[in-house]
Amino acid sequence: MSGHSKFANIKHKKAANDAAKGKIFTRLGREIAVAVKEGGADPANNSKLKDIIAKAKSNNMPNDTIERSIKKAAGDLGAVNYEFVSYEGYGPKGSAIIVEALTDNKNRTASNIRNAFTKGNGSIGTQGCVSFMFDEKGFILVDKEEYEGDADELMMIALDAGAEDMSEEDDCFEIYTSPDDFSAVRENLENAGIPMAEAEVTMIPQTFVSLTDEIDIKNFQRTMDLLDDDDDVQNVYHNVEE
């Protein structure tokens, strides 16, 4: 699992950027809508919705906004039907990029994402062309400033909760689970009073690519900026070391 802290930093930067643009709540609202459509409006019987609600709260989404999103999706009152789509492609130096989106217009989304790759001198590939370079894992981040215990104590709690592994970084602890066990582990940690700064099922790069050429760096950032600006895009995973 070494090297994942770089990925966590990438995700933190994206989250901070989204919050500054006022887009993070829109993206979370779409995730809530899809979860409700798939499994119902009761988080007690819908683990996916329960996980997204926890994620929304960790991003400071107001409770009334969360409730409105759930009721809107459950009642079909003006609700938009979003469809999950994913794209895989290449950035500079063969770097791997995975884009996940929720959209009500697949043609629009495909065009925008293709443009983002092209503007950065990259290209969209076929499904599966880069996903084999990533591992799907549950990822839980515990900020050392928020957690008062020590590493050994947290390791015991995490493993007892069903986690696969844990690593310690300079300012945080990173806990990993299988995708199937993520919901149970997150809930067990929550019940144990463990503060979680981040908790989600994500794609972790097996190896990283380093960009040293200034043009490559600018092209890659151009693609990332365009994807960040797209309201349809929910998640972007890549293996570029920043």
Residue ranges and their predicted role:
Residues M1-G125, V130-F139, D181, E241:
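N-terminal cationic and glycine-rich segments that engage phosphates or anionic surfaces
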Residues F139-E242:
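Positively charged, low-complexity, intrinsically disordered RNA-binding extensions
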